[in-house]
């Protein structure tokens, strides 16, 4: 699968972005959270310490002193168009 197709599939599986006490929760279509977590982890962004994924929910944990707005910017760089399609809660 091409990188562009992988990004499109990741974006289309994301249902919502929720800011939660310095972390970010991503709600997905059931069965997609883990693959999106792997995509984010493989992007290798320093600002993101790690991810934890279940079936339809993904938690992004930023490194110390990294703002959530910076995490959102990192996601937008890795998944262009994410915030336009999904928005934030």
Set out the residue ranges of the language-model regions:
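S4-like RNA-binding module at protein N-termini
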Residues: 1-7
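Non-DNA-binding regulatory cores of transcription-related proteins
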Residues: 7-72, 76-78
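Long, charge-dense
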Residues: 81-89
